[in-house]
From Swiss-Prot:
Assembly behavior: Homodimer and heterodimers.
UniProt membrane topology term: Multi-pass membrane protein
Transmembrane parts of this sequence: 23-43, 76-96, 110-130, 164-184
Family: Belongs to the Casparian strip membrane proteins (CASP) family.
Stretches assigned to the Extracellular side: 44-75, 131-163
InterPro entries according to UniProt: CASP/CASPL, CASP_dom, CASPL
Alphabetized PANTHER family for the sequence: CASP-LIKE PROTEIN 1U1
Protein name: CASP-like protein 1B1
Entry keyword set: Cell membrane, Membrane, Transmembrane, Transmembrane helix
Cytoplasmic side: 1-22, 97-109, 185-195
Protein backbone atom coordinates (compact mmCIF):
# COMPACT_ATOMS: atom_id res chain seq x y z
CA UNK A 1 0.00 0.00 0.00
CA UNK A 2 2.83 2.38 0.93
CA UNK A 3 4.69 1.37 -2.23
CA UNK A 4 1.72 2.22 -4.42
CA UNK A 5 1.49 5.69 -2.89
CA UNK A 6 5.22 6.27 -3.54
CA UNK A 7 4.75 5.14 -7.14
CA UNK A 8 1.86 7.56 -7.56
CA UNK A 9 3.95 10.38 -6.09
CA UNK A 10 6.87 9.55 -8.39
CA UNK A 11 4.61 9.42 -11.43
CA UNK A 12 3.00 12.70 -10.47
CA UNK A 13 6.38 14.41 -10.06
CA UNK A 14 7.90 13.08 -13.27
CA UNK A 15 4.83 14.06 -15.25
CA UNK A 16 5.23 17.69 -14.20
CA UNK A 17 8.99 18.04 -14.74
CA UNK A 18 9.20 18.24 -18.56
CA UNK A 19 6.60 21.01 -18.82
CA UNK A 20 8.65 23.78 -17.13
CA UNK A 21 11.66 22.82 -19.28
CA UNK A 22 9.49 23.14 -22.38
CA UNK A 23 8.43 26.65 -21.37
CA UNK A 24 12.01 27.62 -20.50
CA UNK A 25 13.16 26.60 -23.98
CA UNK A 26 10.21 28.40 -25.52
CA UNK A 27 10.90 31.62 -23.59
CA UNK A 28 14.63 31.55 -24.40
CA UNK A 29 13.71 31.06 -28.05
CA UNK A 30 11.31 34.03 -27.93
CA UNK A 31 14.04 36.26 -26.45
CA UNK A 32 16.52 35.01 -29.08
CA UNK A 33 13.96 35.84 -31.77
CA UNK A 34 13.57 39.36 -30.38
CA UNK A 35 17.36 39.85 -30.22
CA UNK A 36 18.04 38.67 -33.78
CA UNK A 37 15.03 40.57 -35.14
CA UNK A 38 16.21 43.74 -33.40
CA UNK A 39 19.71 43.28 -34.83
CA UNK A 40 18.24 42.79 -38.30
CA UNK A 41 16.01 45.87 -38.14
CA UNK A 42 18.58 48.20 -36.57
CA UNK A 43 21.25 47.32 -39.14
CA UNK A 44 18.83 47.26 -42.09
CA UNK A 45 17.56 50.74 -41.23
CA UNK A 46 21.06 52.07 -40.50
CA UNK A 47 21.74 55.08 -42.73
CA UNK A 48 23.38 58.46 -42.19
CA UNK A 49 23.95 61.32 -44.63
CA UNK A 50 26.48 64.08 -44.00
CA UNK A 51 27.81 67.02 -45.94
CA UNK A 52 31.57 67.32 -45.54
CA UNK A 53 34.04 69.97 -46.63
CA UNK A 54 36.66 68.23 -48.77
CA UNK A 55 38.64 71.24 -49.96
CA UNK A 56 38.75 75.01 -49.90
CA UNK A 57 39.38 77.09 -53.02
CA UNK A 58 40.16 80.62 -51.93
CA UNK A 59 37.44 81.35 -49.39
CA UNK A 60 34.91 78.96 -50.95
CA UNK A 61 34.57 75.54 -49.32
CA UNK A 62 33.91 72.59 -51.62
CA UNK A 63 31.35 70.32 -50.02
CA UNK A 64 30.39 66.75 -50.77
CA UNK A 65 27.34 64.93 -49.47
CA UNK A 66 28.13 61.36 -48.46
CA UNK A 67 25.80 58.62 -47.29
CA UNK A 68 26.76 55.64 -45.14
CA UNK A 69 24.43 52.67 -45.59
CA UNK A 70 24.67 49.05 -44.54
CA UNK A 71 24.35 48.05 -48.23
CA UNK A 72 27.76 49.59 -48.97
CA UNK A 73 29.53 46.84 -47.01
CA UNK A 74 29.02 43.17 -47.99
CA UNK A 75 29.76 42.07 -44.41
CA UNK A 76 26.85 44.16 -43.13
CA UNK A 77 24.58 42.77 -45.85
CA UNK A 78 25.54 39.24 -44.76
CA UNK A 79 24.91 40.28 -41.15
CA UNK A 80 21.37 41.42 -41.99
CA UNK A 81 20.64 38.26 -44.00
CA UNK A 82 22.07 35.95 -41.31
CA UNK A 83 20.13 37.59 -38.48
CA UNK A 84 16.98 37.72 -40.59
CA UNK A 85 17.26 34.00 -41.30
CA UNK A 86 17.89 33.33 -37.60
CA UNK A 87 14.78 35.34 -36.73
CA UNK A 88 12.73 33.34 -39.23
CA UNK A 89 14.21 30.09 -37.87
CA UNK A 90 13.33 31.03 -34.29
CA UNK A 91 9.81 32.03 -35.28
CA UNK A 92 9.36 28.72 -37.11
CA UNK A 93 10.77 26.74 -34.17
CA UNK A 94 8.42 28.56 -31.76
CA UNK A 95 5.51 27.33 -33.85
CA UNK A 96 7.00 23.82 -33.97
CA UNK A 97 7.44 23.91 -30.19
CA UNK A 98 3.80 24.89 -29.69
CA UNK A 99 2.29 22.35 -32.09
CA UNK A 100 5.24 20.02 -32.69
CA UNK A 101 3.52 16.79 -31.69
CA UNK A 102 1.43 17.00 -34.85
CA UNK A 103 4.52 17.54 -37.02
CA UNK A 104 6.65 14.66 -35.72
CA UNK A 105 7.67 12.42 -38.63
CA UNK A 106 9.00 9.05 -37.41
CA UNK A 107 10.46 10.67 -34.30
CA UNK A 108 12.79 12.93 -36.32
CA UNK A 109 11.43 16.26 -35.07
CA UNK A 110 13.85 16.61 -32.15
CA UNK A 111 16.87 15.64 -34.27
CA UNK A 112 15.93 18.08 -37.03
CA UNK A 113 15.37 20.90 -34.53
CA UNK A 114 18.80 20.26 -32.96
CA UNK A 115 20.53 20.20 -36.36
CA UNK A 116 18.78 23.37 -37.54
CA UNK A 117 19.63 25.11 -34.27
CA UNK A 118 23.32 24.29 -34.71
CA UNK A 119 23.24 25.52 -38.30
CA UNK A 120 21.63 28.77 -37.17
CA UNK A 121 24.32 29.25 -34.51
CA UNK A 122 26.98 28.90 -37.21
CA UNK A 123 25.16 31.33 -39.51
CA UNK A 124 24.68 34.03 -36.85
CA UNK A 125 28.26 33.56 -35.66
CA UNK A 126 29.59 34.12 -39.17
CA UNK A 127 27.45 37.20 -39.72
CA UNK A 128 28.33 38.73 -36.37
CA UNK A 129 32.05 38.03 -36.87
CA UNK A 130 32.12 39.61 -40.32
CA UNK A 131 30.21 42.68 -39.14
CA UNK A 132 32.41 43.03 -36.05
CA UNK A 133 35.52 43.02 -38.24
CA UNK A 134 34.11 45.75 -40.48
CA UNK A 135 32.97 47.76 -37.44
CA UNK A 136 36.50 47.61 -36.03
CA UNK A 137 37.85 48.77 -39.39
CA UNK A 138 35.35 51.62 -39.50
CA UNK A 139 36.20 52.69 -35.97
CA UNK A 140 40.00 52.52 -36.10
CA UNK A 141 40.88 52.20 -39.79
CA UNK A 142 43.97 50.35 -41.02
CA UNK A 143 47.09 52.47 -41.42
CA UNK A 144 48.99 49.72 -43.26
CA UNK A 145 46.35 49.46 -45.99
CA UNK A 146 45.68 53.23 -45.79
CA UNK A 147 42.02 52.73 -44.96
CA UNK A 148 40.74 55.70 -43.02
CA UNK A 149 38.35 55.40 -40.13
CA UNK A 150 34.82 56.66 -40.75
CA UNK A 151 33.26 56.58 -37.29
CA UNK A 152 34.61 60.05 -36.52
CA UNK A 153 32.49 61.35 -39.42
CA UNK A 154 29.43 59.06 -39.21
CA UNK A 155 28.86 58.73 -35.46
CA UNK A 156 25.18 57.77 -35.62
CA UNK A 157 25.83 55.12 -38.26
CA UNK A 158 28.53 53.56 -36.11
CA UNK A 159 26.44 53.78 -32.92
CA UNK A 160 23.51 52.02 -34.58
CA UNK A 161 25.86 49.40 -36.01
CA UNK A 162 27.30 48.82 -32.54
CA UNK A 163 23.81 48.40 -31.08
CA UNK A 164 22.97 45.88 -33.81
CA UNK A 165 26.16 43.96 -33.01
CA UNK A 166 25.28 43.87 -29.31
CA UNK A 167 21.78 42.56 -30.08
CA UNK A 168 23.20 39.97 -32.47
CA UNK A 169 25.77 38.83 -29.91
CA UNK A 170 23.03 38.43 -27.31
CA UNK A 171 21.01 36.46 -29.86
CA UNK A 172 24.06 34.32 -30.63
CA UNK A 173 24.60 33.48 -26.95
CA UNK A 174 20.92 32.62 -26.58
CA UNK A 175 21.05 30.49 -29.73
CA UNK A 176 24.00 28.56 -28.26
CA UNK A 177 21.99 27.94 -25.10
CA UNK A 178 19.02 26.84 -27.22
CA UNK A 179 21.27 24.51 -29.21
CA UNK A 180 22.54 22.86 -26.01
CA UNK A 181 18.98 22.56 -24.70
CA UNK A 182 17.82 21.03 -28.00
CA UNK A 183 20.61 18.45 -27.90
CA UNK A 184 19.84 17.66 -24.25
CA UNK A 185 16.18 17.28 -25.15
CA UNK A 186 17.18 14.86 -27.91
CA UNK A 187 19.45 12.82 -25.66
CA UNK A 188 17.20 12.71 -22.60
CA UNK A 189 13.90 11.36 -23.85
CA UNK A 190 10.90 11.35 -21.51
CA UNK A 191 10.10 8.00 -19.89
CA UNK A 192 6.79 7.79 -21.73
CA UNK A 193 8.64 7.69 -25.10
CA UNK A 194 11.12 4.96 -24.09
CA UNK A 195 8.48 2.36 -23.15
Amino acid sequence: MGLQNEEKLELGCTGLQPKPKKWVLLMVRVVAFLATAAATLVMALNKETKTLVVATVGNTPIKVTLTAKFQHTPAFVFFVIANGMASFHNLLMIMVELCGQKLDYKGMRLAMVAILDMMTVALVSGGASAATFMAELGKNGNSHARWDKICDKFETFCDHGGAALIASSAGLILMMIISVMSIMKLLIKPKSDSS
